[in-house]
Amino acid sequence: RSLRDFSMNSVGVEVKTTSRDTSSHLVQGVHQVELADDEDGGVAETRLILVSIGLKAAEPGDDSFTIPQLVDRISSRLTEAGGHQLAEGFLTHVSEYGAGSGLGYDHRTMSADPMFAMPYVTKFFRGYDMTDPAIEVLRRDDIAGRHHVDVSSVRFRVDLPLAASAG
């Protein structure tokens, strides 16, 4: 299993972005939409929140941000809150994200790269409780009965509603 984007005690947080008008996201495996257990030595999760952030290219005059600006802001806040080591850990984590696919971003060496200068605005920001039965996505148990399918190889797109609640 991969590590969560964020963990707070037994609550996992997966962050996904999209340029679509809806909360439509590619999922790298069922581990991104299911509670983590404690088999890998980590903490068993009791809750998993998928944060869906919709982005669009900014128009002139919009209150926008670029990826380097966003990373700078987060890094500055982390330095103020917890010191230089916390910010350095964040920058290291950012550089590891996507590095295996060749699509990563190393803020220390790429912040001036024109490829990352495109300004964005946030269209929406939503949180989904992935333990809510109203969230109907592919789960490990859906695949487990297919003995000739490697569960860890399954990638798929989730199209989440504006809001969901089984209660």
What would you call each of these model-derived segments?
Residues 1-2, 18-167:
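Nucleic-acid endonuclease domains
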Residues 6, 11-19:
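Conserved catalytic cores of phosphodiester-cleaving nucleases, focusing on short active-site segments
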